[in-house]
Amino acid sequence: MHLDEPHRHGEPLSRDGSLERLSSTRFDVIVVGGGINGAVSALSLSAHGLKVGLVEADDFASGTSQESSNMIWGGFKYLESYDIRLVAGLCRSRNRLAAAYPTRILETRFMAVLEQGASFAPWFAALGANVYWGLGRLRTIRPRHRSKSTIHRLEPAVATAGIRGGIEYSDYLLADNDSRFVSELVIDAERHGAVVANYVKLESAELGTGVWNLALRDRSTGSTFEASAQVLVNAAGPLVSNVGT
């Protein structure tokens, strides 16, 4: 039986139900890869009303998406190479994400110290931090220059014998961790109507007349089935070249 519509919004499916939907629905988009890029793609597309399938060969967020620093940052380090346009774009993305998930992404203060042999003075680092703050549209607490004595007073655990001073600035951290964040995005995508399943491997994909025909394998049982979509998104990260092989 061919189903024109995925499950209604807010109705989670059992694994068997998800596999049945994957094989019986003509999707607008099927996303391969359940890391951060795949999860965001599935959520964004399903939130815009498209029929979306999401498959992952292992656990969701089992690859590089669970090996991050848990930071949601605006690219402060790239100011060292004066890449203003890149930092401005990263700050915009950071701000949008923080605004969309205020309980999952939290503003956090950081302190960076400069040793005696540093290539630039603390005042110059403070200037850079203020430029970073400005590129971030002043959305965080303002950065501060910190003298050696102030750092010792505020953070007595920091060894200050060989430092010149430092800066204090804000960026964002995930409230839990990266894999939890990705999993929550996958759940959000399902709430918007996406059909999701992990331990489903793409064996092959063939583009026909305006449609992708996919051969999928349920790794828990070894059984294979077919799925179809107008668009195929390969979001497998560093394994992108291995998908379907």
Regions found by a protein language model. Name each.
Residues 46-67:
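Glycine-rich FAD pyrophosphate-binding loop
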Residues 152-192, 196, 213, 223-227:
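Helix-loop-beta segment of a Rossmann-like dinucleotide-binding subdomain
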Residues 198-212:
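A conserved short coil-to-beta-strand element within the FAD-binding core of flavoproteins
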Residues 1-29, 44-48:
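Extreme N-terminal leader/targeting segments of oxidoreductases
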Residues 33-35, 57:
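Glycine-rich Rossmann-fold phosphate-binding loop(s) that bind the pyrophosphate
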Residues 25-27, 221-231:
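Core beta-strand elements of the Rossmann-like FAD/NAD(P) dinucleotide-binding domain
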Residues 234-245:
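Flavin (primarily FAD) binding-site architecture
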Residues 70-154:
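Dinucleotide-binding Rossmann-like beta1-alpha1 core, especially the glycine-rich loop
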